[in-house]
Amino acid sequence: MKKWLFPFAFVATLAGCSVSNESKQQANDTYQKSDAALPLFAPLNTAGVSLPKQDTTYQLPQVKVKKADQVDIRPPETPLAIIQNSIAQFDGERALIAYPIDKREVYNLQQVARLLKEQGIGYQLTNEKIVTDWAPTGRADEIGDTQVRYEIEQVSSGNYSALFVSILQMKRNEVVFSPHLADKQRYSSDRLNQLVGELDASYRKQVRDLNNSGLMPIQSVLGTDSNGRTALVLGAPFNHAWTKLGQVLPQLEFDIKDEIIGRGVRELKYRPAGAKSWWWPFGRAEGSSGLKTGTYFMQLSALGKQSAVVMTDDDGNALSGEQAQALYQALQNLLAK
């Protein structure tokens, strides 16, 4: 049987690498011993010799010093402006990040609720406000079992929307305590940065996936959607279809004016080029059966690994008849390339 002998120096090195969380939060210096009594010196034995009287100028005063509370030496946490064109700060009670309102579809309470559910954190969502159950902080430098109840709120005003995170309660090892200002800033900012960071990473990954998948051709057939409207059923998932449609619609003289990917909606402006426009072969020579100049909407719905696109006019009526046939056949041809 082989015996493994570890040098003492190696074992000592491993022991030296172990750092307790107490040392991460509290300084181990003379400040911790500030309540120690000052030294007293007994009078010198003069042996009959007359000595000059002691000068009290530099005598240390005997003052009773009361040691203050333990000081948390961890660096403060601050909200980070992770979102482009955003502003982040701590206002004394809440950590907040304000961002352009057009990003509200990505950074909102519904997305925050999804993250909390994935993390196994219980919550109640009412009136644009989330109140969580007790949740671990997720920090590696905690002493004991520290848990927090958070309040997360979304507010929109003008051209901006904002997410707020505040601390409702804190407890350590099942003992509830009142957080100091530094605690409120640290834990509210930490949770806000974590939530917004994950939402931002998820959004960027979705954009990359959309850009990468949009190059592949898509096969499609004419059918109906779940509401019985004439639709083009695409043999591709939502993300792939969304990107590909964004590439081919301008080729059919549709300008994309606005889009909300979270709802699968695009607002389009159609400006036909005349009798030689793409729809001319499907109508009469004068082109009277073609689409008219105006605003249209594209609605894309997910159907498992497939998706369906429906084109509607400005009043929300789905295109039908010769107009739908012409448009969807043109889309079929371009999507398959």
UniProtKB/Swiss-Prot annotation:
Lipid anchor positions (S-diacylglycerol cysteine): C17
GO biological process, one term: protein insertion into membrane
Main localization (coarse): membrane
Membrane topology, record value: Lipid-anchor
GO cellular component entries: cell outer membrane
N-terminal signal peptide: 1-16
Coiled coil: none
Subcellular location(s) of the protein: Cell outer membrane
Keyword terms of this UniProt record: Cell outer membrane, Lipoprotein, Membrane, Palmitate, Signal
InterPro entries tied to this protein: BamC, BamC_C, NlpB/DapX
Matching PROSITE patterns: PROKAR_LIPOPROTEIN (PS51257)
Lipidation (N-palmitoyl cysteine): C17
Highest taxon listed in the record's lineage: Bacteria
Function: Part of the outer membrane protein assembly complex, which is involved in assembly and insertion of beta-barrel proteins into the outer membrane.
Subunit structure: Part of the Bam complex.
Family stated for the protein in its record: Belongs to the BamC family.
Protein name per its UniProtKB record: Outer membrane protein assembly factor BamC
The species this protein was found in: Pasteurella multocida (strain Pm70)
